[in-house]
Amino acid sequence: TIAGMIGMAVLYYFNFAPAWSVIVVNAILASFLHELEHDLIHSLYFRETSVEKMMMWGVWMFRVNTPSPFYRKKIHLLHHKESGQLSDIEEQMIGNGMKWGLTRIVVMLDQGLAFLINSRRVGKTAPKLSKAEMAKAAFPFTYIYQATSLLFINGNLYLLLMPLFNAGFVAPAWLVQMITVVNFLAVVIGLPNFIRQGCLQIVSSSMHYFGDVNPDGTVGVLEQCQVMTARSWYMLPFQLFCFNFGSTHAIHHFIVNQPFYLRQLGAGYSHAAMKKYGVRFDDHGSFARANRYHPASPALLPAGEGSLS
């Protein structure tokens, strides 16, 4: 997968592939890396070896807008243990429990802003959250990504708008060269990962239930996730860039140590069993309920507010 992303970058550099194709293909390839990282977090390959660590570093380097997988392992395993509870750090940080609105959309799309918006509130309900540890886990790749993103947006806006205010404007050569490099990085890794991460978090924060899930694991596992099939047609564009996450992730809550490719291959059989035992499919009403499982439950995390109501 990494070789594929590098290959697309080479094709783009030598003008053999248009920018849009590189962005789309690398976003899809990066979604494979997320699934591989997820399996590594559950120690499915080369457990506790240098090869496992090397693979985790590799998936992080090519998915630059995420925290360290070594830190993600900690909060993801907590997610499995306490999914849907107020102590679930992972899902709260991407918007679970918030009413739909601008704040939630921002939280789902941008990890940096999600940290600034949600970390204080989540810290009150999830005692295992350390803001300092989470900030450290973003170093160095997420900080490089954020800085490069700001250069990409502001640099291109500057070069675009300055001639409108000054007809004789000539951009300095160093600035043009720097923005050329930044634009290349944006096409081959920045924008693909923005699309991948945004799609994943939109799907994940929509399919998980939160706040009123039964804390008894034997019962609660049936309430932790819904399954989003093709009937949730509005999710299909997002599913493309997160490896069909909405359809298969709920299976993972039941069969934790199953590699992602087997989960995809056996999805039809798993769905039949899950439906038999009452797992919900295409529960469109959960959007209006701010991820609550039960329609009568009170709203927990109103958009834009920093405390529980």
Where are the model-predicted features located?
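Transmembrane alpha-helix/helix-exit interface in multi-pass inner-membrane proteins
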Residues: G112-L116, Q197-N214
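A cytosolic-side transmembrane-helix exit/cap motif
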Residues: H38-F46, I202-H208
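Long helical/loop segments within the catalytic core of UDP-sugar-dependent glycosyltransferases
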Residues: L236-G246
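Short alpha-helical catalytic segment bearing the HExxH-like zincin motif
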Residues: A27-L36, S205, F245-A250
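Divalent metal-coordination and catalytic microenvironments
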Residues: H76, H208, H252
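Short active-site segment of divalent metal-dependent hydrolases/proteases
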Residues: I41-H42, G211, I251, I255-V256
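Juxtamembrane helix-capping/reentrant segments at transmembrane boundaries
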Residues: Y45-V64, I89-W100, G217-M235
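Non-catalytic, topology-defining segments of multipass membrane proteins
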Residues: T1-F32, L36-E37, I41, K53, ...
